[in-house]
A protein has these predicted regions:
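Conserved redox-active cysteine motifs that mediate thiol-disulfide chemistry
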Residues: 1-6
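Thioredoxin-like thiol-disulfide oxidoreductase module
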Residues: 9-80, 88, 93-100
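Thiol-/selenol-based redox modules, centered on thioredoxin-like
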Residues: 78-128
Length: 128
């Protein structure tokens, strides 16, 4: 996603305007301290890979799929972990659902039906 989705200028602009973007290595070996807790690296057993407790907490204890994107609200409550690669078109729809607070008013399945890509919105504004 670093080479595709996160190179899209519309996505970069929207993320910078609406979110605090943080990249976390799910296998980071150093502690991360928050006011509530110290998150640590958990070593894998045998051939299993280790993981960081913060990555597990953010994905709500689910198996960590790489890459994963997690959206949090203003109070740092996990709204939704999004597992796996998302192309720019799909990611844009997901990020605007959360970034413009549509999740507070509608289900994602309904939002998908009425979604207008940012590029189309820009063209509409230019033509008006």
């Amino acid at each position: 996603m670093d080479k595709t989705t996160f190179q899209n200028p519309d996505i970069v602009k929207f993320i910078n305007e609406k979110f605090y973007a943080v990249k976390l290595d799910s296998e980071r070996k150093t502690d991360i301290t928050t006011p509530e807790k110290v998150y640590k690296y958990v070593k894998g057993v045998g051939k299993e890979r280790g993981y960081h407790e913060m990555a597990a907490a953010l994905t709500m204890g689910r198996l960590i799929t790489l890459p994963s994107t997690v959206f949090l609200d203003e109070t740092f409550r996990v709204l939704q972990p999004i597992p796996g690669y998302k192309n720019p078109e799909t990611f844009e729809m997901i990020m605007t659902f959360y970034g413009d607070n549509h999740y507070k008013r509608t289900l994602f399945t309904l939002y998908q039906k009425s979604y207008v890509p940012l590029e189309q919105l820009k063209l509409k504004l230019i033509s008006e």
